[in-house]
Amino acid sequence: MEDQLSFFPGGLRVMPVDGDTKNTRTATKTLSTLHYSLVATHTTASAGLCTLSSDNMTDVQTVLCDVKKVVSSGFDFRRVVETEHHIPVIYLLSTTEPEQMVAGEDTEFLNHLLLKATYIVRKPLDQATMAQLWRVVAWRRCCLEERIPRDSMDDIAAHAGVVGKDGNDNDVIIIEEPQVHFKVVRSRGSRKRQLTINVDSGSSDGADANPRQKLEHKKDAKGPLGQHVASHLQPQEYCTKQQKDLDERRLLSLDSLFLKAILSTLNVSLCNPLILTVPAAFTPQDGMTMNKDKAPMIELPFGLPVDDFLVGQTAYGSAGPSIGAPDDNDDDAAMYAYTSALNNNAAVGSLMVPPIESTFTIIDPIVGTKGEGSVPVVVVSEDQNNAVAAIEATAPNNAELFMMPEQVAVDAPVDVEEGIMFSLESLLGLDEDMIPMEDAGGEATDDSLNIKEGGMEIGWDLDLDYILMNNTNEFAFLDDMAWIE
């Protein structure tokens, strides 16, 4: 009794929180016998917390609370009271089996409360157990006061407005009291509780917040722990480095001369010419088209070997050795490496398709044109000449032997499929060997009129001035016209 009075001179002041009226009367009688005084009695945990938080609250030294009221309240009553008011909370338990008290989600919350409880007393209260309760309360109050001393808090509050001599407050230390926040959420008729405690918010730094940094920090440690962490981080660092190397790998440039050379030969239509892109060092020559701000383009007929067109061309557009035999210049050698790959020599691995065979034979008539508005040139085969000669031999001889039928207009289009075309000599009734034909270019040379016959040279000096064209669109020689007259 003397020890109890040394700690609590006026007696232990207790506040019961219990909804059972019968149990409350029994507890009041037992506590009065032990010289414990009752301050107030509440039926819910929330009502008891409001009384403790009020300004006119009397000095309460301990709280006896039924654990079922704490479960129904939805928050940890003990933790709030002990943290905010530094008053020990003793739980009252009616039965020994928690499953018989609550069900569902409340069972887990009840187990949590009993696990963290300061002290648990069974109901009904036993006088021998309650006689030693003051010792539990005294020890718990001492622990709560040692954690946050009241004198230290008073000193900090007194010096909160003190400023240093240099005008700053670096010498002032401010300690925040631990805060406890509670949230009660009702969902589907049951209560879900979430407890968030911020006791020491400034103790964690940025390195502890990142698990990766934690591992790297432990990697520097010596001993088996550092070796284990290093072996765990090594595969991750290798995979990260390998992925970075793949991302930084540079792709092949599409401006390469080799790619431009081979891409133009792929999927080329049979009706389109082959377009070969050459470096800008080439100067525009015959058969080349120049486009502004672009490399010159060489248009080649499909199937024509590249070497046949580029013979004598160098990287600088001047005359030089064939591409097939590059000199010591590095640019020429590099150009030969690409051009030789495009050469259509029917070699294995050639990039160009073989030449397309001609759809016509050399004995069929061919109509070729050169330039715009030029006269078509007709080439007649030997079989057709023989047929014309046979027809002329059987034809009757008339007075106008040297007169030819009406000619088609020169500018009229020629259709090969509608009729057979004959040469001018066949229509005039002259032999092929007498008057030579003009070449495909329409220009006759001086030597083309000198024909050897029987070892003698017969000179022909035929001029267009001797040929006149009358109104009937017929040709006549001046000598014949004079003889007829």
UniProtKB/Swiss-Prot annotation:
Location of 4-aspartylphosphate modifications: 66
Cross-referenced PROSITE patterns: RESPONSE_REGULATORY
Response regulatory domain sequence ranges: 13-138
PANTHER family documented for this protein: TWO-COMPONENT RESPONSE REGULATOR, TWO-COMPONENT RESPONSE REGULATOR ARR14
Modification note: Two-component system major event consists of a His-to-Asp phosphorelay between a sensor histidine kinase (HK) and a response regulator (RR). In plants, the His-to-Asp phosphorelay involves an additional intermediate named Histidine-containing phosphotransfer protein (HPt). This multistep phosphorelay consists of a His-Asp-His-Asp sequential transfer of a phosphate group between first a His and an Asp of the HK protein, followed by the transfer to a conserved His of the HPt protein and finally the transfer to an Asp in the receiver domain of the RR protein.
Organism in which the protein naturally occurs: Oryza sativa subsp. japonica (Rice)
Stated family: Belongs to the ARR family. Type-B subfamily.
Gene name per UniProt: RR31
SUPFAM superfamilies registered for this protein in UniProt: CheY-like
GO terms, biological process: cytokinin-activated signaling pathway; phosphorelay signal transduction system
Biased composition (Polar residues): 195-204
Record's function text: Functions as a response regulator involved in His-to-Asp phosphorelay signal transduction system. Phosphorylation of the Asp residue in the receiver domain activates the ability of the protein to promote the transcription of target genes. May directly activate some type-A response regulators in response to cytokinins.
Protein name per Swiss-Prot or TrEMBL: Two-component response regulator ORR31
